[in-house]
Amino acid sequence: MRFASLASGSAGNCMVIEHGSTRLLLDCGLGPRDLASRLISRGLDSQQITGIILTHEHDDHAKGAFKFAAFHNIPIWLSHGTRVMVERYLPEGLSLDLRVIDSHQPFQIQDIEVAPYPVPHDAREPTQFVFSDGQHTLGVLTDTGVSTPHIESMLTGCDALVLECNHDLEMLKNGPYSPALKKRVGGRLGHLDNGSAARLLANLDNRKLKHIIAAHLSAKNNTPELAQAALAAVLNCGREWIGIANQVSGFDWRSL
């Protein structure tokens, strides 16, 4: 199994998870031309995508999914709450294969097993995912205000983690956001700060961990160096070992 990011941040998110002939997009918050270009940068063609999994309905995660899926005749997996909230995206006159999932029930998409889990975020029924090829697991957590025991039980023992490090608390406090937006981002249904991500990581069994990527970094309230330092301190490793998913280019393929 291998995985890459096409983009990560408030302007658009999309990951690719691949095993065998199965290639899944996790979220699709990119326009069609941008998505096609970024897939080419990872050596892929749009026709090679098996399907799309959505974490929640926010624009930066979902806005490009439905036209892409309709054009390429591929299914979309999403929670019931997300399904209810995405009506505004659905293209008129085009049929879509929307597959509603139970956020506590694993399911199989060809060569990849997908284990969903609910998270606290300000969306209708937000869900994050752990992916497995039968030998290795990739845990993804990109939009949550806080950790929970269930989140940690899902992510413990993974071979790879993509972990939200959205903001530095001091930078958010002193940054340009309005008081209301600061409260939202830093709240229990907002986004995970560097310190909270580090504490979550410290609660996991990381003995099998081969890759860790800090994701969904705020351009105004964080820096890659701060996110790397927070996670590296937990793992007792050099900062350079902590990967960064950025807005411009995501991150290149990582293999398990």
Residue ranges of each PLM-predicted region?
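Active-site metal-binding motif and surrounding structural segment of the metallo-beta-lactamase
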Residues: 32-78
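Active-site neighborhood of phospho(di)ester-bond hydrolases with catalytic His/Asp-centered motifs
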Residues: 26-29, 50-57, 77-80, 139-142, ...
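Metal-dependent catalytic neighborhoods of phosphoester/phosphodiester hydrolases
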Residues: 63-72, 87-89, 222-229
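Conserved beta-strand hairpin/beta-sheet module of binuclear metal-dependent hydrolase folds
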Residues: 1-42, 127-143, 160
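Cap/insert and terminal regions of metallo-dependent hydrolase folds
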Residues: 149-246
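Active-site environment of divalent metal-dependent phosphoester hydrolases
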Residues: 58-62, 84-85, 123-124, 146-149, ...
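Structured catalytic core of nucleotide-sugar glycosyltransferases
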Residues: 4-14, 56-65, 87
